[in-house]
A protein has these predicted regions:
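Core SAM-dependent methyltransferase catalytic element
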Residues: 149-162
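Short beta->alpha hinge that forms the Motif I/post-I loop of the SAM-binding pocket
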Residues: 53-57, 104, 129
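A short SAM/SAH-binding and catalytic strip from SAM-dependent methyltransferases
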Residues: 91-103
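Class I SAM-dependent methyltransferase Rossmann-like catalytic core
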Residues: 1-7
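Conserved SAM/SAH cofactor-binding pocket of Class I
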Residues: 10-94
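A short glycine-rich, Lys/Arg-flanked "PGG" loop and its adjoining helix->strand segment in the class I
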Residues: 106-118
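Conserved class I S-adenosyl-L-methionine
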Residues: 127-142
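Conserved beta-strand signature within the Rossmann-like core of class I S-adenosyl-L-methionine
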Residues: 119-126
Length: 162
């Protein structure tokens, strides 16, 4: 697993720019790494943020970064949705871990439906050339929109029906 120790990677930066949340939303930063997406959501829209991370070192960094940035949030260690039981969210944000393989990425997409509220959205960033990811999001949700493209990355959004 790789982290960007000195700067936010380009994909995460693009998702930060495009992320849509409302005041008071409950947001899940799935596979949060050191917490950039969740921290931005908490600061921008005063969201209730839950972050999950399987890597103990990254989870510890996310907790520390929440503290350093003076924002509320909860970091739970575990794989993907496992630490969440039956919780639901208004928004799930994720920098899809393409290096983990499509099977893992598809688990993220398919699992999102069980953790999104009515009208909730899955907002992800992925490397360009990810037609199979876009197709899977459409199959899972019946919709997918490319909201941004830059530097080899795309931000894709699918929404739950209401």
């Amino acid at each position: 697993m790789r982290f960007s120790p000195k700067r936010v990677d380009r994909g995460t930066a693009l998702l930060v720019e495009c992320m849509k949340t409302e005041d008071g939303d409950k947001v899940l930063d799935l596979g949060c790494g050191y917490g950039v997406l969740g921290i931005v959501a908490a600061r921008r829209a005063r969201c209730k943020v839950v972050m999950t991370e399987i890597n103990a070192r990254a989870a510890a960094l996310a907790r520390r970064n929440l503290e350093l940035n003076g924002v509320e949030g909860e970091v739970r260690e575990g794989n993907l949705y496992e630490p969440l039981t039956h919780e639901t969210f208004d928004t799930i944000i994720c920098n899809l871990p393409m290096s983990a393989g499509l099977r893992h990425v598809f688990e993220i997409i398919d699992g999102a439906k069980g953790h999104l509220r009515e009208h909730g959205s899955l907002q992800v960033v992925v490397r360009k050339g990810s037609g199979r990811v876009e197709k899977r999001m459409f199959e899972a949700f019946g919709n997918v929109e490319t909201v941004a493209k830059r530097g080899g990355y795309r931000v894709l959004v699918s929404k739950m029906p209401g």
